[in-house]
């Protein structure tokens, strides 16, 4: 319809990780800019537990390659704290995110909102630690979680997401790729710069919290 009406617009959308190349190319021709995809996890068991439509990680990798061929950006979403998650599956998911290497990625712990299946599952399994909604966000408005999975505490899940962001975005290969894209595509330069500022702010926020804790910690002199 966009092509038929000759609309000159730029748009982004959510997408499954199995959109074929010919459709991706058509989406680009119609003004598509970015696909937001919920890859979520590298664990087949976890993907099955949360009823993801695309459980084949190889197919997802092929999708990202095809999106690049179509000159479309990919924003990857990864969620931890799902049923079946362990320290091993979290590590697998981070490695998977690096292998996929979407243009941008977000790592967040699961947010089990009341009225959702995730909330019901967490309540029935005992994974939900509190019903206090104030615990869902920290003082700066960043996501926390009220879910605990086995040996993984809610703080473990939050800490992993912070670690995942650092490992994903501070890779030399990623920084180089983003720099090249900014040079080749001036339209994306501002978005890349803005994203970098947000990342640095987040990293310094975490660093500041650690420094505060260090100053508050008792010393031998005390």
Model-derived features: positions:
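A structural motif corresponding to the C-terminal lobe/cap of the Radical SAM core domain
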Residues: 2-186, 214-221
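Short linear elements at protein peripheries
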Residues: 192-222
